[in-house]
Every structure is written in structure tokens, then in C-alpha cells.
Amino acid sequence: SLAPAAYLLFNRVMRHDPADPSWPGRDRFVLSCGHSSLTLYIQLYLAGYGLELDDLKALRQWGSLTPGHPEYGHTAGVETTTGPLGQGIANAVGMAMAARRERGLFDPDTPAGQSPFDHHIWVFASDGDLQEGISHEASAIAGHQQLGNLTVVWDDNQISIEDDTRVAMSE
């Protein structure tokens, strides 16, 4: 259900360069709901990060560039390994805090929006991510630190591994 939003982010909003996946000024995309890895892999394929159609067909196959959960260092364009629900949210909060700290240390006088450290962190999170305690703790510090360079997009589809989310969650 987040595929159209991912397409919009990668093609109209995010600053990134498939020719230089490690460019320091790039925006970061974290798929906290790593089980929906195909959402990310399709965007990397369409954006030109080096994935081929055969890589997408090999989804979740041993040795493929498209494992069941995104793995940092395995597939170009993947910013962090995600698997345990909620972990991606916490990683993204850390990335946002680090970007702000790096800007303060290395580029404090550059006007807003012109520093390579002004990148934005985008997170896709599922209901299952938000049911995990780590996401609550990470969100609390993000709010306390007023991280304006972090956006979490919540896929509020009321689905969890157990059943409808109303069984265990009313937020």
C-alpha cells in the first residue's frame, strides 16, 4: 500500500544520486517494515541503482541482491538493515540526530538547505513497527530533540501478524 508513496518520494522529493549511492548530501530512506522489501527494491530498480529485472525476480532467494529484508552493504541504495520491527525507526532517529550534529560540527555557518548535512531522513513504518517498544522510545527522543529532518510515513492498514491491529492496539 506504500508503493505509490515510495515512487513519489524517490522521483519527486528525495535528493539522491544512483551514480553515487554514498553521496553525503543524499536524503536517506529507511524501510522500517523490512518485510515489504520489494517496495524498496522496485524504487532502486526504477531509479537506476544497478538492480535488474532478474534481481527482482530473485526476491528472497539465497545469494540474490534482493533478500527478504533489506541489508546495508549488500544492495546499493539500502541505507540500513531492517528486520526486527521498529528497528528502522530507531535507526532513522539516530541518522537524523547524527546529521544535525555533523552540520553543527562541520558546516554551522552555511545557510539552511545548502549544506550537505541538511539531508532529510524518510521512514516507512507499519502498524507492527509502531507496536514495538523501541519505536516508542525512539519517537520520544525524536520529539524531545525536535528533529525537523525526520519524517515517518505510517502505513495505517490495521494489519498485524496476529490479526486486525485492534486486537492489541488502539493508538
Which residues does each predicted region cover?
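Long, well-ordered, tryptophan-enriched scaffold segments
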Residues: 153-171
